[in-house]
Design a protein with these regions (language model features):
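Generic beta-sheet signal
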Residues: 38, 150-152, 165, 189, ...
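N-terminal helix-turn-helix DNA-binding module of bacterial transcription factors
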Residues: 1-67, 340-342
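Periplasmic-binding protein-like
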Residues: 123-131, 185-190, 220-221, 241-252, ...
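Flexible loop/turn connectors
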Residues: 239-342
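Alpha-helical recognition/docking segments in bacterial nutrient-uptake
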Residues: 1-9, 68-176, 180
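Short beta-strand segments enriched in small/hydrophobic residues
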Residues: 24-27, 61-77, 87, 177, ...
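Hinge/beta->alpha junction and helix N-cap segments in small-molecule ligand-binding domains
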Residues: 56, 74-83, 102-110, 163-173, ...
Length: 342
C-alpha cells in the first residue's frame, strides 16, 4: 500500500526504492525491451509500493511528443553561455519547440544527474548541454540518458554529437592579424584554466606564433573573463613585458576592456604603443575606446545548427554530421595597427 506523503512520489523516489537509476525506471515505464526481468520486477514493485503515477509529461517523454527540449547550462550569466542560450531558445521556437533550462553553478556528475532527474520528471524530448568547462566532458561520458544529447560549445564527451565554434582558428586569426601588422612578440591574456574554450584559444595563439617561428612568451597571464581580471592582468603585463609590449591577444572582450584601461593608466596608447585584439565581439566592443578588433562568434548559427542536430537525433534522422564546427570571423577595428618603429 502506498505510504502517505506530503507530495506525490516521483520517478526519482521509484529509482531510489528499487535501487536503480532514473534511466532504468524510464525504460521500464516505456516498456523498453533492454531491461532484465528481475530489474523490471523491482521497478514495478517500487511503483506499486509508492503509488507512483506518471504524469502527462512523463508519459509524453516515452512517446517523444512533448515538443520540449531540455537545456543544462553552467555559468549562464557570462556573455558566451548567455548568448548561446538565447540562440538555442530562438532556434527551438522557430521549430515549434519550447526549452526547459536548468542552470548550474558548477557541472559535475552529481549536479548533472540531478538536473537530468528534473528534466525527466518534467518531460523533454532531448537534451542540450552548454557547459564549457573541461570537467563537463567527463561528467557527460559517465551518465546515460533515455533521450538524445547534443553538446553546445567546446565541452564535449567522446562520441557525443555537438556543435562548436572553432576556438583554435579564432585565436590563430587574432594572433596572425597582429603578426601580419609587423609585431614580433604577441602576449596573451588567457581565460580560466578549467574552460576548454580558454585552452583552445591559448593553443591557437601558440600555434600561430610557432608557425611564424616565434617563441611564445610563457606562461600567459590569465583571468576569469571579467574586466577586473583583465585590468589586473594588464597591470602585470606592463611590468613583465616592459618595452617588449607592443601587441596583446586577450581571450575575451570583457577582459580586453580591463587591459585597455591598464594600458591607458600606464601611459601607453592603443593602438599607437600597444595593439589589442579581443574575442567574442560583444555588442559594446565597437564602442570601446578605441573600438576593439576582435573575433566574432556566430551564436545564431550555433543555436540553429544545435537544434537541427538534436531534432535529427530525436526523429531518427542522421542527416547532420555528429560534430559541427562553425568558423569565427575576425572583425578589424582601430585597436590594432602596425608595430611602432624601434
Amino acid at each position: 500500500m502506498a505510504q502517505p506523503s506530503l507530495r506525490p512520489p516521483t520517478m526519482t523516489d521509484v529509482a531510489r526504492r528499487a535501487g536503480v537509476s532514473h534511466q532504468t525506471v524510464s525504460r521500464v515505464l516505456g516498456d523498453h525491451p533492454n531491461v532484465r526481468d528481475d530489474t523490471r520486477a523491482k521497478v514495478l514493485n517500487a511503483i506499486g509500493e509508492l503509488g507512483y503515477r506518471r504524469n502527462s509529461s512523463a508519459r509524453a517523454l516515452v512517446t517523444r511528443r512533448t515538443r520540449t527540449l531540455g537545456v543544462v547550462a553552467s555559468n549562464s550569466t557570462l556573455y558566451g553561455p548567455a548568448s548561446t542560450l538565447f540562440a538555442l531558445e530562438e532556434a527551438a521556437r522557430a521549430k515549434g519547440y519550447l526549452v526547459s533550462t536548468v542552470s548550474l553553478r558548477k557541472l559535475t556528475v552529481k549536479t548533472l544527474s540531478e538536473a537530468l532527474d528534473r528534466l525527466i520528471e518534467g518531460g523533454v524530448d532531448g537534451l542540450l548541454t552548454v557547459a564549457p568547462q573541461q570537467s563537463a566532458a567527463a561528467a557527460l561520458t559517465e551518465l546515460s540518458t533515455p533521450f538524445p544529447v547534443v553538446t553546445v560549445g567546446s565541452g564535449s564527451g567522446a562520441g557525443i554529437p555537438g556543435v562548436t565554434v572553432d576556438q583554435h582558428l579564432g585565436a590563430r586569426l587574432a594572433t596572425g592579424h597582429l603578426l601580419d601588422a609587423g609585431h614580433r612578440r604577441v602576449w596573451h591574456v588567457a581565460g580560466p584554466e578549467d574552460w576548454q574554450e580558454a585552452q583552445d584559444r591559448a593553443d591557437g595563439w601558440r600555434a600561430a606564433l610557432a608557425a611564424a617561428g616565434i617563441e611564445p612568451p610563457e606562461p600567459p597571464l590569465s583571468g576569469d573573463w571579467s574586466p577586473l581580471s583583465g585590468y589586473r592582468a594588464g597591470q602585470e603585463l606592463v611590468v613583465r613585458a616592459g618595452r617588449e609590449l607592443t601587441a596583446v591577444f586577450v581571450a575575451n572582450d570583457q577582459m580586453a576592456l580591463g587591459v585597455l584601461r591598464a594600458l591607458r593608466e600606464a601611459g601607453l596608447r592603443t593602438p599607437h604603443d600597444v595593439a589589442v585584439v579581443g574575442f567574442d565581439d560583444i555588442p559594446e566592443a565597437e564602442f570601446f575606446a578605441p573600438p576593439l578588433t576582435t573575433v566574432r562568434q556566430d551564436f545564431t548559427a550555433v543555436g540553429r545548427r544545435s537544434i537541427t542536430l538534436l531534432l535529427d537525433r530525436i526523429e531518427g534522422r542522421e542527416s547532420s554530421p555528429p560534430r559541427i564546427v562553425i568558423e569565427p570571423q575576425l572583425i578589424i577595428r582601430t585597436s590594432t595597427s602596425p608595430s611602432p618603429p624601434p
